[in-house]
Amino acid sequence: MEPRVITYTKNVFLPLTSVCRNRCGYCSFRTPVQEGCVMLPEEVEAVLAQGQAAGCTEALFTFGEHPEEEEGFRAYLEKTGYDTILDYCEAMCRLALRYGILPHTNAGILTYDEMKRLRPTNASMGLMLETTARIPAHQGSKGKEPEVRLAMMEDAGRLKIPFTTGLLLGIGETAAGREDSLIAIRDIHKKYGHIQEIILQNFCPKNNTPMAAFRVPDTQEICNTILMARRILPEEISIQVAPNLIDASRLIGCGVSDLGGISPVTIDYVNPEHPWPAFNDLKKIVGDATLQERLCIYPRFIRPGWYDPGLQPLINRLNQRISRGSSQP
């Protein structure tokens, strides 16, 4: 019997802005329009330089959804020298490529044309489905309408973009709702074959949010959801948990196959109170399994060419580099 392989990526986290049109009850990432709400180009470049020196292969670009809808945001965006957040994101993705790091953008709801525009500079993209249920946590958050998120996932499939999605567990959904969400992901993947992985992320309450006192799902509940996902989803879709948010060592046996992006350079800006595990601790987390670094584009998508031809030299070079290296970080 072959040993199990647990994968991870080495990344830098680049939150281009914390301004967002949504008002999710569990989120502390979103901030008002204020000084420092936009990451400036020189700040992005400094992080990319550190990431290059640390051997990072992924630049995770995130920003609040449709920040231009928030009054006063454009005045701060102008300081970057770009007219729209999409212009800025595209330019910073190109900058990441010049540093030899593959971009992965997760920016909330994007249209078909917006994703098509970003595709040449992104090895993969993502959007958390979170849930197909309508829940109080998403009141005032039009970007969290399930139909809108599912439609974007379909558009990504039509564009042949390797895609990451997932569920946020413990925000008011039920076990039946989780099953419905997993089935929806499975059905979209059956049509397009583009889902690389799903993240099963446990809710972590944040101070000074409406859901600060919500119950946190326990490890057994997360394990049951992982088992459900493994039963519903095709084997080629990896199941990821975040090792800074939960004791991943207790979930490896439930069917987890990936630990996601872990950074030697940047914090988890969405969950800043939860530091990444040290790279030397990852082997302890996976136990008897084999730990293997990967790129943000999974190997099975490299061979068929699910990316812009302009990315091929860098993808091949980075893939060869991590393939030659040890499974140790």
Curated annotation (Swiss-Prot):
GO molecular function, a single term: iron ion binding
CDD domains: Radical_SAM
Necessary cofactors: [4Fe-4S] cluster
Residues annotated as domain Radical SAM core: 6-244
Binding residues for [4Fe-4S] cluster: C20, C24, C27
Catalysed conversion reaction: 5-amino-5-(4-hydroxybenzyl)-6-(D-ribitylimino)-5,6-dihydrouracil + S-adenosyl-L-methionine = 7,8-didemethyl-8-hydroxy-5-deazariboflavin + 5'-deoxyadenosine + L-methionine + NH4(+) + H(+)
UniProt KW keywords: 4Fe-4S, Iron, Iron-sulfur, Lyase, Metal-binding, S-adenosyl-L-methionine
Self-association state and partner proteins as the record states: Consists of two subunits, CofG and CofH.
NCBIfam families in alphabetical order: F420_cofG, PRK06245.1
Function: Catalyzes the radical-mediated synthesis of 7,8-didemethyl-8-hydroxy-5-deazariboflavin from 5-amino-5-(4-hydroxybenzyl)-6-(D-ribitylimino)-5,6-dihydrouracil.
Protein name per the record: 7,8-didemethyl-8-hydroxy-5-deazariboflavin synthase
Record organism: Methanoregula boonei (strain DSM 21154 / JCM 14090 / 6A8)
Gene: cofG
